A protein has these predicted regions:
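N-terminal secretory signal peptides that target proteins for export/translocation
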Residues: 1-23
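Bacterial N-terminal signal peptides
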Residues: 29-39
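Short, well-ordered alpha-helical
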Residues: 40-103, 125-128, 369
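Structural helix-boundary/capping segments
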Residues: 42-44, 111, 115, 162, ...
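Short helix-loop capping/hinge segments that flank enzyme active sites or metal/cofactor-binding pockets
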Residues: 69-92, 295-347, 404-415
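Gly/Ser-rich, acidic/histidine-flanked active-site/gating loops
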Residues: 72, 78, 84, 107-111, ...
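Short pre-catalytic strand/loop immediately N-terminal to key active-site residues, enriched for Gly-Thr
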Residues: 92-99, 137-151, 381-382
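Serine-dependent amide/ester hydrolase catalytic core
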Residues: 307-397
Length: 444
């Protein structure tokens, strides 16, 4: 009876949101929380004893201790020949056959005989930001065990921060490389939409999906990008030669309401210490950024429904994942097409901004990483909170590249936060050059 009641509550919540139309978007985080709360089954972080140590990996192939090859981890929504692509899901791990071929994004790594050390853990179907996984277990944030690792590329970030890999390939649809990088103190790059092939990658939202590298530092992230795009090392060298110091780089500082003042101060301190030419961007851009954030969330959530709606009531799919799918059904029917219609205007806005500055700077997250919830009812609240505090999805909505790089933070529960740098299309080399300068300055 409890399960029937839970389903009826979910249905009534969805129905009310549909009736409210686009204005109902303001209530979506509340609905997401309530859908999880009413799911009718346990959704506490799981533990699968088959996984090694910190649960960073779903499949792990220990490297030769004497090898000097670059170690590469691959998120488990990217096909590796002969290995089941689980996308972080119990149902896929039980029903899917091993991939028949590698995803094309692995071609360069294979040619260079990079040592692939495993398939990394992730949030199921890559559709939530906490980094939690009910079946394979939640990867343990090595910097503070009681904090979320961030997602959906949680295993990548934990493996990097734990020293288990040098580079990781992940996907970023709404922040999935940058958010875990921000939570675990590593580097994450979201690449320009369409730059890296996404064939052989389990989809979330084809308008937003990207593949990109994560690294334990900027140098390794550059190496990761060079494994994804032939000739990138030369582009990066050219970017360093063109702008060897921060004084020649104009950075537009974007400030958003609701950001922890300590985090804003940490971002300002990092920019000042690096020596960029900092230009304050006006509030009108902040308003447009917030609208793009809402639109990007709408499109990303709808993508979860489009890609995974068939699993809404399937056994072997986590309740929290089902709630995101239901959330996506709401956004698909109430705002998906109108959000996509506003995309070109947001892209034009950013192009205009990049006529005046080289890069845009803001925090990756408006708050410090939250703790892992201990009660079911807190999980929905956590996911809704993360929708509000991540500054990532507006970038995916535009298709531009962005870099998350750790910087020091004072007076908080963690000693770091994450600076997000946004660039024009195809500016990955410029972003990593700027990240190099930041990393060097804050570590002096």
């Amino acid at each position: 009876m409890a399960i029937v009641l839970a389903k009826s509550r979910q249905t009534s919540s969805v129905a009310r949101m549909k009736q409210s139309g686009p204005a109902g978007f303001k209530c979506l985080p509340i609905v997401l929380a309530s859908l999880v709360l009413c799911s009718g089954c346990s959704i506490l972080p799981g533990f699968n004893k088959k996984l090694p140590g910190n649960r960073a990996f779903i499949d792990y192939w220990a490297p030769d201790s004497n090898s000097k090859q670059l170690r590469l981890a691959v998120k488990d929504n990217i096909d590796i020949k002969g290995v089941v692509t689980t996308a972080g899901s119990e149902i896929f791990s039980r029903t899917h056959k091993p991939a028949e071929k590698d995803a094309p994004c692995l071609a360069i790594a294979r040619r260079r005989k990079v040592q692939i050390v495993g398939k990394t853990n992730m949030t199921e179907f890559a559709v939530s930001t906490s980094g939690m996984n009910e079946y394979f277990g939640t990867p343990v944030n090595p910097l503070k065990r009681n904090l979320i690792p961030g997602g959906s590329s949680s295993g990548n970030a934990v493996a990097l921060a734990s020293g288990m890999t040098d580079v990781a390939f992940g996907t970023d649809t709404a922040g999935s490389n940058r958010v875990p990088a921000a939570c675990c103190g590593v580097v994450g790059l979201k690449t320009t939409y369409g730059l890296i092939p996404i064939e052989g990658v389990y989809p979330v939202e084809p308008h937003l999906d990207t593949v990109g590298p994560m690294g334990k530092d900027i140098d390794h992230t550059v190496q990761g990008m060079d494994l994804l795009q032939d000739g990138f090392a030369a582009k990066y060298a050219a970017a360093k030669a063109a702008k060897p110091t921060a004084r020649s780089i104009r950075v537009g500082r974007l400030k958003l309401k609701g950001t922890d003042p300590k985090i804003d101060q940490a971002i300002d301190d990092a920019l000042a210490k690096t020596g960029f030419q900092v230009v304050e961007l006006d509030d009108s851009l902040s308003d447009k950024f917030e609208q793009a954030k809402k639109d990007g969330t709408t499109v990303a959530a709808a993508g979860a429904w489009i890609s995974d709606g068939r699993f809404e009531f399937a056994l072997g799919v986590a309740a929290r994942t089902k709630s995101v799918i239901q959330f996506g059904q709401i956004t698909y029917t109430t705002g998906y097409r109108s959000a996509l219609a506003r995309r070109s205007a947001w892209q034009r806005t950013l192009r205009d901004v990049f006529e005046k500055v080289d890069l845009i700077a803001l925090p990756t997250l408006q708050k410090t990483p939250p703790g892992l919830p201990l009660l079911n009812l807190r999980i929905g609240i956590l996911e809704a909170h993360l929708l509000q505090v991540q500054n990532t999805v507006a970038v995916n909505f535009a298709g531009n590249p962005a870099l998350a790089v750790p910087v020091p933070l004072s007076g908080a529960k963690v000693s770091f936060t994450s600076l997000q740098l946004i660039g024009p299309r195809l500016a990955e080399a410029d972003l990593l050059n700027a990240g190099r300068l930041v990393e060097s300055a804050v570590n002096r």
